[in-house]
From Swiss-Prot:
Cellular component, GO annotation: cytoplasm; nucleus
Pfam families registered for this protein in UniProt: HRI1
Superkingdom of the source species: Eukaryota
Organism lineage: Eukaryota, Fungi, Dikarya, Ascomycota, Saccharomycotina
Localization (cell): Cytoplasm; Nucleus
Name of this chain's protein: Protein HRI1
InterPro entries: Hri1, Hri1_N, Hri1_N_sf
Modified sites of kind Phosphoserine: S143
Amino acid sequence: MPALLKRLLFQVGPHPNERTFTLSSVSTDGHYISLRXFVKPSGDELSFPFEWAFAGTNETVKVNDQGNGVVTQDFNFWLDTNVYLNVPNTHRGEVNTTWKNWDSGCVEETGAVYPFGADKESVSFRELWQPVDPSREDLVIVSPNNEKFSSNARSIVLKVTDEAYDGLVIVIGRWIQGFFVPKE
């Protein structure tokens, strides 16, 4: 079943700081995209008003069900704006995460990245996600009481790889996300 998630919280270090309106989409077959646009971009952010955008195919993520509502997911992004823009001090390579379902229906994601290199100290992060109903036009919360959710929403994936561009577009129910990057 496809999924649409709204990020509620982003935390690195002791203080949460959510400056984006982030939605992540997952297709029925496991393709994923996450667009993290700044709510109030300023300064240099105005030229590219995204904290980050990344996407991948079901071949670039390893998922393992640990039981009791816990899943590990190891991502190796196929498309990554930090790589494309050559942003300094950003993680490269696989990101290992743990996802835990809360009784409220929210999903906590934790992990660590290595922005200064794999041989340097890691930086832990925490994100809190709220599943939303992809068949609705508004952001309608799914499973507020941890009830089983089913939807007739379908997913469509368009992957572009040609001599000029790489890109991924995912349609989940009534929602669409995508981005393309020119090849150098």
